[in-house]
């Protein structure tokens, strides 16, 4: 699970959350809480700079094209920033960790995840949102989701 990426490992958190939402089963959250927490710390300690996750392995490698010839375009104006993707996913994981901390009885962690999430969200908007155009980054579909 400890990779230098955020997007794919986020599935680990998402599956636990989906099991809780669909079945009310909190056991996966409780069982894996320490591992979730360790992953958040790993990313923070190794890849967080000025509240932006500065590394992404995969990025937006298969963006929706206007035509099929463009599906694997190498044009940088068509690719979503890996930093944008990783930071957005990291923020989502911090939001989930607030919930997981509460559900697993780790109430002492809730404030940390909330404060971290608030900082990440502010940094994300500061770096990627263009108020004059009303879109994020280079205005790809993925960047604006």
Where are these regions (language model features)?
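Active-site acid/base region of carbohydrate-active enzymes
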Residues: 1-3, 10, 22-88, 101-145
